[in-house]
Amino acid sequence: MLCPWQFAFKPHAVKNQSSEEKDINNNVEKDVKVHSFVKDDAKLHSLSKKQMKMSPIITSAEKHPQNGIKASNQISRCPRHVKVRNMENGSSLLDTLHLTAKEVINCRTRACQGALMTPKGLVRSTRDGPVPPAELLPQAVDFVKQYYSSFKELKIEEHLARLETVTKEIETTGTYHLTKDELIFAAKQAWRNAPRCIGRIQWSNLQVFDARDCKTAKEMFEYICRHIQYATNNGNIRSAITIFPQRTDGKHDFRVWNSQLIRYAGYQMPDGSVIGDPASVEFTKLCIELGWKPKYGRFDVVPLILQANGQDPEIFEYPPEIILEVPMEHPKYEWFKELDLKWYALPAVANMLLEVGGLEFTACPFNGWYMGTEIGVRDFCDVQRYNILKEVGRRMGLESNKLASLWKDRAVVEINVAVLHSFQKQNVTIMDHHSAAESFMKYMQNEYRVRGGCPADWVWIVPPMSGSITPVFHQEMLNYVLTPFFYYQVDAWKTHIWHDETRRPKKREIKLSILAKAVLLASLLLQKTMAARPKVTVIYATETGKSETLANSLCSLFSCAFNTKILCMDEYNISDLEKETLLLVVTSTFGNGDSPNNGKTLKNSLLTLKLLRKNIRYAVFGLGSTMYPEFCAFAHAIDQKLSQLGALQLTPVGEGDELNGQEEAFRTWAVTAFKTACDIFDIRGKNSIQLPEIYTSDDSWNPKKHRIVYDSQTMDLTKALSDIHGKNVIPMKLKFRQNLQSLKSSRVTILVKLSCETNQEVHYLPGEHIGISPGNQPELVHGLIARVKDAPPADQTIRLETCTEGGYWASEKKIPACTLSQALTYLLDITTPPTQQLLKKLSQLVTAEGDKQRLEVLCHSTEEYNKWKFYNRPNILEVLEEFPSAEVSTAFLLTQLPLLKPRYYSVSSSCDMTPREIHLTVAVVNYRTRDGQGPLHHGVCSTWLNKIALNETVPCFVRSADGFRLPKEPAKPCILIGPGTGIAPFRSFWQQRLYDLEKKGIKGGDMILLFGCRHPDMDHIYKEEVEEMKRKGVLKEVFTAYSRQPGQPKVYVQDILQNELETKVCNILHKEEGHLYVCGDVRMARDVAQTLKRMLVKKLNHTEQQAEEYFFQLKSQKRYHEDIFGAVFPHEVKRI
């Protein structure tokens, strides 16, 4: 006979825990269990002691039975509580509730499994028979105890009577049934115990619908329809659960096959694309195979597939009127409606299992209401879902080709704004993720007060956006399983035993033996096919990961026809070089033309090789920035070395400019390399190879996709620039401008002072950068407008619109509504030489055959293009003058010209010394192209700052430069090296030190300035101010290098560094742990670094390797600071 009392008065754990069951928090045995039925235990014991002898309750003071295990082998018992801390406010909570945890959900191995989607401990599989009574009874007793413990007043008699009833029912039938009140209690507790739910603060308000009398799938459907209508409530969403009959023997289960009651279909098309929700593709196929007629829309609600009493499933379509959907719109962006998005109002999970006291309810759909990010981030933005992020970013005019622009973050915020706005406008319940996080913190604190714990899965609780600015991010959490509980289940269609085999979806079942043979055969055929293909090795070197991304893309492309593998350069064995058939190299250039760190080994190994015994083929693509003179230098060095070794170049070196269409350039180069390789290696069927989608986009200009419409609004330049660049642009005024060079000098360096409006403030630190958004020269703008065939009136505001795939016109958000003159002056880059991609599109607009032929050569020959570009350095107006038959439209310029990027300058003032002002030191750039014989070109920003009138607006913003700040310890000595305008940030340094000395009484450490210029009477800028700083004790010593004194040898800063400051520099850096700052162009910085390394070799008796390591340590310790800018003008042009 079954006896409940042996379980009723034991601790919470019924059976002795073996070493296999570990506590999920401490990974030790659960030797201690807390008795959850605390109040009046003695009374209940006295009532039952006639029937049985009560087993002692285990406490932490009692000794464990030996059980034949040596004491030395015992695992220490887990603590009575675990402390969870809040990193934000320093508070802590003590969790004891976890001691009653039921399951081991993960982390029983050495590898943490906390981020797995469905750990084994959270999944319940099917059963082959009923739960044995001996297993069921203790779980039933435990649940009954939990239920009666929930009452404020004890109901001992009712509790005992219920225990006897349950015991008899299990004894006679093998199972038992919950009362309706117990079912309601269980459902609410299961929600309360759900560790992955952030919205549990509403757990006690759950509406429970008891559908245990249901017999058929049709009745299930009727219950679910009533559930949806109740829960939707015209948008005022109410949480509810419908519970169908419990599992009996595992062969008569009730199941809802859908993962959610409402979900959109996903249709896999023949070309591999998906219409609708990609997450629903598999289930949608199942619906179609079961007889549902697809509609092939983006937002088709899939039907319900319901299984009653273990029978084959039936399919039901919802009446349209019971599904509430919310069309998406944005409070600011009108074009958001044009995306034609919507979402259903009711989130209802349908495929989980409710476990209560050993009973399993396999069909129990339940709902809450949406948190905005569930739709706005996961459903709309996940790559594997609707994936609208890039489209939204494009419409917002964001730089989606540059991750550092944070375009994804800006776009996802606006998408979530749209979701919240749309639901609120339709009066449909939704909660933003910040409010949800706040409510969870309140719930968690209350649960610790009431229950002594709160199971929570941090990975799921923290919302998918905003991270550490939500309070839950900073809260430690314990994750454990209590009972009652909602478990995951294996998809029903994967386990269902069909009664009518004719209705079974076609699974194309194959016997295991046949399948094994087929797999083996396919494997052998694949190996044979791959072995027959020419081998290609792709190697890459990277600092930021961009080269690796492109190398993987290249590998995918070549895998269409070649046997490819990919390696990082530091994994590549140089001895394999002669074994290669085709070697593809993708690499960035680091610093002053050096290799990335993971390319140095290969670089050194290549230098040791003399000649290859086999003629391999190769191709190289380089990434870099044309701001620097050593653009793609490492890529060219590899190309040159491989050529010297006798390797054959497949295609010319490709170059990807970070500032101008890098990915476009890579795709063009990659396709060219692939097609050339297919020709050389005579690949069969090369003309019918299906390339990856990324390589098949059309680069041609289609004028029918764009149009210009007139607009009445005027552009707010500051707001427009803020939106375009994602910066807090401040409209400052030009207060003062002074030429710092002598009037006898042919060059100009200006001190620019900008001031705030009276109602504004600006904050910055010495050494930080100021971004200036300049204007292009009026002469250039007017000349360009004169070449536009459909230029609108000068003062007419225009708006660019693009035709979408659906055929409607949408405003293009790359640039706002403005006049053409404003766009060409402030928003678009008209001075940078056009890319090959732009020239290719321009070739469509020329009418003269000669122009067309020349443009075709420039488009397809990288060598010719580079010669042309570096010799002419043409702006877009000069290009149109070179190809006079080109007829460009307003839409062409607005869509094809790149955005005008801000120019950055080191701040030359102290915010404390000159509040509400920004001072800049600017070299005005003028140069002639074509070896000095070409047209006169001007630096965009420097010329603009030198020509605008006083009090004219200068849009600017502050950019942090964390690596170029004064020492945190003011007493540390500093060496400042800055020739020319490299002195700019050091002026902010000495002004700050002077302010600290005179206003705060803080005496800074020794500061030595090493300046360089051409001639003492020409361009020795800030000479008097520097002398004053020396007199006041702010600067201890000042050294100046003059490179153009008549009759004197050229002296540069690195010469003085080595000849006059060798001992001093080594003492400051090595003994006094001081700081060294270098500001200037990249060549000077490289020379200073090399000089310093030679000094270290000499003064510290270091080897070259040790000097390199010491130099690296200085940088790591943030005691060697560089503020380096690219060459102001390239080698091929001559400055005047």
UniProtKB/Swiss-Prot annotation:
E.C. numbers: 1.14.13.39
Protein residues bound to FAD: 769, 903, 905-906, 921, 923, 927, 940-942
Positions annotated to bind L-arginine: 260, 369-370, 374
Textual note on the cofactor: Binds 1 FAD. Binds 1 FMN.
Keywords of the record: Calmodulin-binding, Cytoplasm, FAD, Flavoprotein, FMN, Heme, Iron, Metal-binding, NADP, Oxidoreductase, Zinc
Quaternary structure and partners: Homodimer.
A cellular component term, taken from the record's GO annotations: cytosol
Protein name: Nitric oxide synthase, inducible
Positions contributing to Zn(2+) binding: 107, 112
A GO biological process held by the record: peptidyl-cysteine S-nitrosylation
Cofactor(s) recorded in Swiss-Prot or TrEMBL: heme b; FAD; FMN; (6R)-L-erythro-5,6,7,8-tetrahydrobiopterin
CDD domains according to UniProt: Nitric_oxide_synthase (cd06202), NOS_oxygenase_euk (cd00795)
Compartments reported by the entry: Cytoplasm, Cytosol
GO molecular function: calmodulin binding; flavin adenine dinucleotide binding; FMN binding; heme binding; metal ion binding; NADP binding; nitric-oxide synthase activity
Binding site for (6R)-L-erythro-5,6,7,8-tetrahydrobiopterin: 378, 459-460, 473
PANTHER family, per database record: NITRIC OXIDE SYNTHASE, NITRIC OXIDE SYNTHASE OXYGENASE
Protein task: Produces nitric oxide (NO) which is a messenger molecule with diverse functions throughout the body. NO may serve as both a paracrine and autocrine signal for modulating osteoclast bone resorption. Also has nitrosylase activity and mediates cysteine S-nitrosylation of cytoplasmic target proteins such COX2.
Designated gene of the protein: NOS2
Binding site for NADP(+): 747, 981, 1014, 1043-1044, 1050, 1052, 1054, 1087
Reported regulation of activity: Not stimulated by calcium/calmodulin.
Source organism (scientific name): Gallus gallus
